[in-house]
């Protein structure tokens, strides 16, 4: 059963939430990348990163000229030596992508965010410098 997202009329496939929950609870994935399928009007899983993959692997997997959503499970150790985990929701909207695509991603974002319960921080980026690893570290701590 697919879930409808907000005003865009896009449907989110069951695999979208399943992959997110596997990342959040089972730690099977380090990240999940989502893609909008314009013709079928669905949000689908584009790629999942194995537990051993890094933030750099996620950044490298994002296309230079197409928009994507991504969730990333950031693990870190606090100054008190406590292990922590924060989930980031990233909207990737590169300047080279089509205007129509940017608008579709913008209008679908809130619906997808509501379904992906447990996200701690949001990040929007139009080029790689706006989503560098240092930005993730600064936001999480």
Swiss-Prot record:
Q: Gene3D superfamilies of this UniProt entry? A: Severin
Report one GO cellular component.
actin cytoskeleton
The knockout outcome noted for this protein's gene is: Developmental defects, reduced plant size, early flowering and decreased number of inflorescence secondary branches.
The record's subcellular location field reads: Cytoplasm, Cytoskeleton
Q: Which GO terms describe its biological process?
A: actin filament bundle assembly; actin filament depolymerization; actin filament polymerization
Q: Could you tell me which residues carry Phosphoserine?
A: 8
**Major site of localization recorded for this protein:** cytoplasm
Q: What induces it?
A: By auxin, gibberellin, abscisic acid (ABA) and kinetin in roots.
ADF-H domain location: 8-141
Keyword Cytoplasm listed: yes
InterPro entries, per database record: ADF-H, ADF-H/Gelsolin-like_dom_sf, ADF/Cofilin
Which keywords does this Swiss-Prot/TrEMBL entry list? Answer: Actin-binding, Cytoplasm, Cytoskeleton, Phosphoprotein
| One Pfam family from the record | Cofilin_ADF
> At the top level of its lineage, which domain of life is listed?
Eukaryota
Q: For this protein, what is any one GO molecular function term?
A: actin binding
Explain the purpose of this protein.
Does not display typical F-actin depolymerizing activity. Exhibits a high ability to stabilize and cross-link actin filaments. Functions as an actin bundling protein with the highest efficiency under acidic conditions. May play a role in the modulation of levels of histone H3 lysine 4 trimethylation and H3 lysine 9 and 14 acetylation at the FLC locus.
PANTHER family in the cross-refs: COFILIN-RELATED
Q: Which family does it belong to?
A: Belongs to the actin-binding proteins ADF family.
User: What is the protein's given name?
Assistant: Actin-depolymerizing factor 9
Q: Which organism is it from?
A: Arabidopsis thaliana
